[in-house]
Design a protein with these regions (language model features):
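Catalytic phosphate/metal-binding cores of nucleic-acid and nucleotide-processing enzymes, i.e., regions
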Residues: 1-93
């Protein structure tokens, strides 16, 4: 499954739950997550999406570590099942 399909699925699932999944690019900072997801319960997540055979670049790994150090919500998701699990968990909290 291609990353583009997984990304479309994320956007639709978040929309179905009343949230928004903003496409995010930062020319000055490589490695930033693909999407910033705002959920109706007030949570904001930085989401990196990958095809099942995809790998994080070194810059993406650094971004993930930075988010953890700043207590930000971050996830790298490789499948529709992971998207469903993470979003259901996040909306429930």
């Amino acid at each position: 499954m291609k990353e583009k399909i997984i990304e479309k699925y994320l956007v639709q699932r978040v929309k179905d739950l009343g949230g928004r999944a903003y496409k995010f690019t930062s020319p000055a900072h490589r490695g930033v997550a693909d999407r910033v997801v705002c959920l109706p319960n007030g949570q904001t997540w930085f989401i990196e999406l990958k095809a099942p055979d995809g790998r994080l670049s070194e810059m993406q790994k650094i971004f993930a570590s930075d988010m953890a150090l700043m207590n930000q919500k971050y996830a790298c998701l490789w499948s529709k099942e992971q998207i469903d699990g993470r979003i259901i968990e996040a909306v429930s909290n």
